[in-house]
Amino acid sequence: MGAELFYPLLASIIGLLMAGTPLMAQLIGRKERENLPFIVRSGMVIGLSVWALFTAAYFFFIDDLLASLALEAAVEHIARYYLMTMIGVVFFLSLMIPLRCLTDTAGSTSISMKLFLMAPVINGIFNYLFIYGHGGMPALGGIGAGLATMMTYGFLLGLFLLVVMKSKDLGGRQIFSSLALRSKDLREYLVVGVPSGLSIFMEMSLFSLIIVFLSRYGTDALAAYQIADNFASLVYMLPVSCSMALTILIATAVGAGDMTLARRYKKAGFVVAMGGAMMTASFTVLFRNSIGSVYTDDAAVAFIAGQFLIYSAGWQLFDAISTPIQGILRGLKDTRISFVLMVLAYWGGCFPMSLFLDSHTALGADSFWLGLDFGVGCSAFLMILRLLYVERKLDGRPMPSLSWLLTLIPGRKTAPAAVYAISLQRNIKKAEELLDLWTAMEEKLSMLMQKIKESEVDIYEALGSILPIRLSLLTDLHLSIIGHASRAYIP
């Protein structure tokens, strides 16, 4: 119970502090490595501020929170002290994540990979000691699990500090030789990090809320949901890895002013993410029953989980689009609009669709999985639109023309000049003026054609007979519309 309450908050804090990655990568691209210590210190200060808020919130609100959950006395005791150990977890994370951003960008992602591969072993040893009470330690049960997690993160922080201080490339001594901060670094860290952290929190809270609605379909449906969700989260690590790599690579290329290289990284990231998603989605669908059997011996739960895994295959394909784009946008330090789009996709698309299908169809628990697929699909679509907009803005290219909307005005017809004015100049007033001119010219041309028909003159007979028409009407018309005269428009 304590873990369920804490993990959405923990993921949000990590998302906030990982904003250091694009900031540091762009500095490296601009060859301004001397400014890296300011970013690291800014991240640590922000992290410690979050830790202080979390600590204060725990001591002020823990009693009311646990009372509102109406837990059994034994469960409440474990949850209370498990969450107390999480205070230490947040403290160690607040100092460790900025250092990880530094090693990932200024060093190599293999550094953090090697250190985090040690975490399960370390955590297993601490769990053995504190959960079951071996080696002279008290058997603390669930509280021991929290204590083991806290000590594991403390051990990892020590390893990161050791690596940073020993490496000349990472400049560890410069980081801790001064406490100087710059307000612009703090502000930029928050501008990039807060939307990232909030988007993670909103997404994880939605998934947690869906469990509440699924509870009325019985324990089998809940267990099957957790199986499918756990496997989908495991597979999700592939697009997340691509996203993190793209953040570093794109930010470094943009910092160096090499947009061509940034586009190459973007294409490579999509190829890897989509290729991996197609393989994992195919594997999920083909072996869905076997996957469920790995998690449980209950045939009914495994069967339901197999059905849910089909929907999770849809997630994988959509995530292979939206997640890398989020990494690209973070590399460009564009996170605020992405956060709004994520909220719209999940809380404005996924959640209402899930409730609608649940109340208006007989799909049962499948309603929420279809809603989740719809939400992730909306997220992918909106992320594509945002990326296209940001790319055009960086290139100085105009946005796609919306001049076709003028055709919806009653009695109006669009014209080349109006298209040109809107798409290139964004001058709506000029477009309206040219539309008026176009309408007037059409009326004059219609009257002229009517007179020609009445006089039964063949205007195709000789060039001389139509020369006055060209000079008096058509040339002026074409000059107004396309900027030069052309015989192609002569009737």
Regions found by a protein language model. Give the residues of each.
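Short runs within selected transmembrane alpha-helices of multi-pass transporters and secretion channels
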Residues: 14-17, 86-104, 112-123, 145-161, ...
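Helix-terminus/linker motif at the lipid-water interface of multi-pass membrane proteins
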Residues: 1, 66-73, 129-140, 201-234, ...
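Short alpha-helical transmembrane segments in multi-pass integral membrane proteins
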Residues: 24-91, 137-194, 250-315, 357-423, ...
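Positively charged N-terminal leader segments that act as targeting/secretion signals
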Residues: 416-417, 431-434, 439-440, 454-457, ...
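Transmembrane alpha-helix boundary and packing residues in multipass membrane permease domains
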Residues: 22, 63-64, 128, 196, ...
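Transmembrane helical elements of multi-pass membrane transporters/channels
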Residues: 85, 89, 96, 119, ...
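Small-residue-rich hydrophobic transmembrane alpha-helices
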Residues: 1-56, 93-112, 211, 224-288, ...
